[in-house]
Amino acid sequence: MTFFKKIFNSLRFWQILSLILLLMIVSSVALYIYSRPSDDTFVIEDDFGGNLFPSAIVSTASTGTQVYIPSSRNYIGNAQSELAFRIRAPYNLCKIHVEVSSTPFFQRSVSDFVLPKKDVEYMVFPDILWNYEALKNNAQSVPVSVSISVSIGREDPVQKVKTYSVRSINECLIGYKDAQMNFYDTGIYFAAYVNEEHPMIDQLLREALNTRIVRRFVGLQNGESQVDKQIYALWFMLQKRNFTYSSVSNSILSSNVVFSQRVRTLDDALESSQINCVDGSVLFASLMRAINIEPVLIRIPGHMFVGYYSDKKKENLNFLETTMLGDVNLDDFFPEENLDSLSEGKSQTEMSRLTYNKAKEYATKKYKEFEDQIKGKGPNTLFLPISKETRAKIQSIGR
C-alpha cells in the first residue's frame, strides 16, 4: 500500500512540476509577444502631404529659422528637416534611438531623443545630414524612399519606409493647412530666390553702367532722383537683353493641404530670357539689393510686383510692374490710353522710358487698390522687405 502511495505522490509531483513549467513557458511567450516592438510603434507622418521642399531646407540651413510650425504642439527635434514620425511614449523619460537610411539627398543620419511623459504622442523630427548640392540641383520633383528605424530603450529596432516627393528647387512653399484646416503662410520663402550675390550680378551692373544713364551705383546716397535713375538703368539694361513675358507658372503639385509657387532662379531667368511677375520681381529685387536699395516683394491675389524704398528713413515706397519688361501689349495694362498706337516710330530708348514710367504707374495703382488687404495680411497677399532682418532668417538658395 505504501509502495503505491509513493508512486501516486511521485506522479502527482511530476504533474505539478510539468504544469508549472508549462505556465512559465506560456508566460514567457506572452511576455515576449507583448513586449517586443510592434508595427504600430511609430508612424511616419508629416504636414506637407509627403512632400519635401529643397528651397525651404536650403534657405534656412545656416540660419536655423523656424518658419514651419508643426501641427502637433508636442514635437521634438528640428522641424525644418520636414521629415517626421509620430510615437507614443510607453513610459516617462523614454529614450529612443533613431536611424534614417541614406538617400541621394542626405547621408545616413543618427539621433537620440527623450520622450518626457508616458502615454503622450510626440511628433519627432530626426536630425538629417542633407546633401545641399543635390537639393539645389534638383530641377524636377522625384520620388525617394525614406527608411526610418526607431529603437525604444534596449528593444530591437522597428523599421518603417515611406515614399516622399522631393520637389524641384524652383518650387517655393507658400503655405500649408493643418488637420483643422487652419492656413499657415510661408511666403517669406520667396526671399530665397532673391540672390544679390549671384556671380552674374556684377556683369549685369556693368551692362547697366554701359547705358550711361548713371556713372555709378550709389544706392540712397544722392537723393530720390538719383535712386530713380539707378532703377531705370537696371530697367533699360534688362530690356536690352530682350526678356519676354511668360504667364505665371503654377506648381504641378496637386494637394489640398500644401501650396507652392514655381519661381525661376536668377540662373534660369537669365538663361531663358523669360520672366513672369514672380520671376521679374525676384530678379529686380536681386539687382536692387546689390546696389543697396532695399526692395519689397509685394503679392496680391494672382500677381506679384516689386517695391523699393527711395530714402533712408523708409518713408517713400515706390512700385514697379516687372512684367512690362517684356514684349507686352501696353493696352492690356492701360486699355483707355491706346498706348500701342502712340509707340509707333519711337526709338528703343524712348519706348524704354515710356514703359518704365507706365510700369511704375501701374504698380502704384495696384498697390493702392489692395493696400488695405496687404496691410491687413489678407489671404494671398504679401509684403516682404528683403531687409537685413529678412536675410538673417532666409538665405538665398544660391542659384
Segment roles from a protein language model:
Residues 278-366, 370:
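Hydrophobic/aromatic-rich core segments of domains that either
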Residues 36-175:
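Beta-strand-enriched, solvent-exposed domains that form extended recognition/catalytic surfaces
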Residues 1-12:
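N-terminal Lys/Arg-rich, disordered targeting/topogenic segments
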Residues 83-89, 93-108, 161-165, 181, ...:
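Alpha-helical and coiled-coil interaction segments, frequently adjacent to or embedded
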